[in-house]
Amino acid sequence: MSREYSDTEQRNLDASRRLFAPPPGFDPATLFANDAVWWNGLPRLHAPGAGCEHRGIAAIRRLMGSANADTQHLGIDAYDLGTTRYEDLVELVDGDWVMRQHTMHAKTKAGRDYTNVYCFVMRFDAAGRIVHLTEHWNSWWADRFLFDQLAPTPAHPL
């Protein structure tokens, strides 16, 4: 069942779509308010003790930029955002809220196939910026698949 969206709802839906398919040269961090919060449920993506919240635009920029960092030496086989594609897209819009669920497919930096289901719930302010984003995903699978990818090494006697 479809319905017509209000101008505000359409603006918010368009912004959520730009977050996942930004046009060339567009900085997706500009979609967020300066005091926005991004919660993603996997504390290993943060500084130790930081929990699951990325609070403020600087923290959100660090999170978004971390996908391009070389982390293989740390045993993290991150997915390459340049290889992502989405299927099974579901979008729900209600006033200041947008919910987007999709199945994401990508290659990791080591060339492995990665697939996971994500659900993003976003709340927008009156200016059309994201003030809160909650990222639900199969974090157990991501943790097992993307992290701890260093080969075991034996102890070396003196």
Protein language model features and the residues they cover:
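C-terminal and inter-domain tail/linker signature
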Residues: M1-L158
